[in-house]
Amino acid sequence: MSAQSLLHSVFSCSSPASSSAASAKGFSKRKLRQTRSLDPALIGGCGSDEAGAEGSARGATAGRLYSPSLPAESLGPRLASSSRGPPPRATRLPPPGPLCSSFSTPSTPQEKSPSGSFHFDYEVPLGRGGLKKSMAWDLPSVLAGPASSRSASSILCSSGGGPNGIFASPRRWLQQRKFQSPPDSRGHPYVVWKSEGDFTWNSMSGRSVRLRSVPIQSLSELERARLQEVAFYQLQQDCDLSCQITIPKDGQKRKKSLRKKLDSLGKEKNKDKEFIPQAFGMPLSQVIANDRAYKLKQDLQRDEQKDASDFVASLLPFGNKRQNKELSSSNSSLSSTSETPNESTSPNTPEPAPRARRRGAMSVDSITDLDDNQSRLLEALQLSLPAEAQSKKEKARDKKLSLNPIYRQVPRLVDSCCQHLEKHGLQTVGIFRVGSSKKRVRQLREEFDRGIDVSLEEEHSVHDVAALLKEFLRDMPDPLLTRELYTAFINTLLLEPEEQLGTLQLLIYLLPPCNCDTLHRLLQFLSIVARHADDNISKDGQEVTGNKMTSLNLATIFGPNLLHKQKSSDKEFSVQSSARAEESTAIIAVVQKMIENYEALFMVPPDLQNEVLISLLETDPDVVDYLLRRKASQSSSPDMLQSEVSFSVGGRHSSTDSNKASSGDISPYDNNSPVLSERSLLAMQEDAAPGGSEKLYRVPGQFMLVGHLSSSKSRESSPGPRLGKDLSEEPFDIWGTWHSTLKSGSKDPGMTGSSGDIFESSSLRAGPCSLSQGNLSPNWPRWQGSPAELDSDTQGARRTQAAAPATEGRAHPAVSRACSTPHVQVAGKAERPTARSEQYLTLSGAHDLSESELDVAGLQSRATPQCQRPHGSGRDDKRPPPPYPGPGKPAAAAAWIQGPPEGVETPTDQGGQAAEREQQVTQKKLSSANSLPAGEQDSPRLGDAGWLDWQRERWQIWELLSTDNPDALPETLV
């Protein structure tokens, strides 16, 4: 089925078998007028009578129109000529009636009609939805004919009905085009980062981020998955372990050992045991999932009871009133008031449960819109993903990995035992060696297997808890260090001593997240026990007896439980007993080294992080941009950095605790991880702020800021600490361009700024200027002059964010936003909300720099007095700088407030010199205290000598800008 035959069937173009060419041409024109997304050039050339041999011969190539090997420019003329020729009559096409009728309906993105958004696969010319695919490729070919010089991007962007047109570019085609065409920084929504040689990443905007060692728990789920691949590659290339290394699989089904088979047979015989084991003898990931599910069930029951009691308490006042009012009424009214509390207190009715808690049945893909109280539900759903993927035999690549740090995957039993022993057993001599009560240990095991929330108190024996922990590790189907890496861990002893620790670190990176987190918790506990092995003196001067459990003794006990091979039979074990003894010695040495160096083993050095980012940059550059910006924002705030370190090293260990210290944001990928902390809302609002093609974020103080690549010259920039201001008040600061007007003499280290102050165009000079979001007054200024002076391109204040070499000679125009009324005299006036005034913010990118600069420059020339206009390429020295606040410039601000500069007449008569006053007022608004906080703007400086003059000028401004003045602009033009 050729593409040209589709055009014939759809548009009913003229053919040799048609009755008359004129009628067919008119019919095709009438049909094309009903389509809102086709180029008008089609109407004139659709019914021309030319030879159809060439068109039919080349119509078969329409399916390969935008293939990567054929440029659009070379295909344009050929396909244009083929579109004008009448195609041969198709014999296998369906009737053209339904297709033509579908063109008359309005096209929307949800519709599947040919005139709507085309959902097609460009690699397959025919197949499912083949009509839409062929036609979607044919129509751009016709459009490419008249203008063969246009590129594919211009064709897709031109002559279409906006987002609902037929030229909505498919995602996969754009991904291929991204690698074919040279990168355009303005076209990509994410910043392009480049890796330097010293683990430093530089962005297109000039920001530089240096990587540092971080705990492995602080990495996102996607980073940890890529870290496995990077570690696997380095082990194969750099480490000679003389064995085959494979990445362990999470949740694999293992063959049952003889002991497990006997245990399962015994459980089948004992039918009185109605519970399914929840902890012992199960894969580690399943144990964690069971813990999460049980914790979720408990929380839901507790919340339902709380909601039911709250519901009853809320209804009791109404019930009491109605009962007191209707004591003499019928029994039916009394019964109706008593039925509601009885129904609400019933635990079986789900009505008291709020709507949000009944959202557990939703798909995992849409769990990002749950609130903060659903973090445990998120974790339970996320933990159930590996089991579901394994049961459905899905590929690991198909799983959606989060860009946020996942919570600690440590079983509740392991964490409870470690906490109990750290609290009560550090001074117990011979811990893990002294025998325990088998009966009490069996009882504790059954309680954990039933899923009961066991609370280990002081009355529980330390030796019983220690035996329970060893039994849990011994009964795991797969050891904690996995059987795939058994030989690799042992062969690390064959390496040089300086290489052993690095190889162990890479092998730990290969472990699944649940094994890695549990191993970290266990090694941390064993390290604490080993530190209390020797006798020491307490703070009170008393001698404290050590537990005598050194790292070697602990490795001797836990080594065979952490790393062992599967024993198929007792006979095989007896034959290989001598070899097992040698391997046991090696296992003990490996575990001892891990206990002594556990802190360094779970830190990710910068070189591995750099490899992970390079690996991600090849496939997902937007993810690299997201991760690097988050690293910069984390390091910029010390409190977030401390909380991240405390989360990674200590604090929450159990799988029942939420990852409240997670600092990830809403990622470009679907996010399955727990709900993040409240601090991440700041960065999320920065993501949502419309700032052009490149989003600029907070840069930490310790990171070096280099000059912007697009600037003609490099200047200093010193970002200050971020103010603790909520970004919900103003998502961006539009007055950052003020800093380009600062001179070298006004430098002051007291500048404070926010994320929106660093623009791509302006390298900021340090000054005592406060750039928080709170410095914008709630009202816009009312511009003086007639409405004709403000053309359509300059409504209010225009924000430009790019810089060109043309702006080198002169500073940015002083666009200010001042308070139109002093707060002292605005008591009875209705203030316009800030949201309304924000409608007049016009954001211009780098491509409209010249137009916006001309507009604002013209506005400045009209509003500035003649003596203060810039001459040539420089600024007149008589023009004083705007009065920036700060401890370093009170004298300059006071001097500018007390008197105007030379050459400017001070208006005294309001009626006689109205024009000059208007110019001065507008100039003052352009260069006045726009960067002053609202408190400093409106508070009169009683200590200044010119306070009365300043107050009089403020009143004149207010009177001039009031609504009673006919010269003021209308409300809608401000």
Swiss-Prot record:
Keyword Cytoplasm: yes
Pro residues bias: start-end ranges: 85-98
Compositionally biased spans, kind Polar residues: 101-116, 656-672, 752-778, 920-931
Keywords: Cytoplasm, GTPase activation, Phosphoprotein, SH3-binding
Motif SH3-binding per record, residues: 342-352
Superkingdom: Eukaryota
Tissue-by-tissue expression: Highly expressed in kidney, heart and skeletal muscle followed by retina, lymphoblast, placenta, lung, brain, pancreas and liver.
Modified residues (Phosphoserine): 37, 264, 363, 667, 673, 680, 711, 754, 772, 777, 786, 820, 928, 931, 939
Site entry: Arginine finger: R433
Subcellular location, record wording: Cytoplasm
Bias kind Low complexity: ranges: 12-24, 326-348, 889-901
One function term, GO molecular function aspect: SH3 domain binding
Signal peptide as annotated in the record: none
GO cellular component: actin cytoskeleton; actin filament; cytoplasm; cytosol; mitotic spindle
Span of domain Rho-GAP: 401-602
GO biological process, one term: actin filament organization
Family matches, as PANTHER family: RHO GTPASE-ACTIVATING PROTEIN 6 (PTHR12635:SF6), RHO-GTPASE-ACTIVATING PROTEIN 6 FAMILY MEMBER (PTHR12635)
Function of the molecule: GTPase activator for the Rho-type GTPases by converting them to an inactive GDP-bound state. Could regulate the interactions of signaling molecules with the actin cytoskeleton. Promotes continuous elongation of cytoplasmic processes during cell motility and simultaneous retraction of the cell body changing the cell morphology.
Note: ARHGAP6 gene undergoes X inactivation.
Protein's name in the database: Rho GTPase-activating protein 6
Organism whose genome encodes this protein: Homo sapiens (Human)
Taxonomic lineage from the root: Eukaryota, Metazoa, Chordata, Craniata, Vertebrata
Gene: ARHGAP6
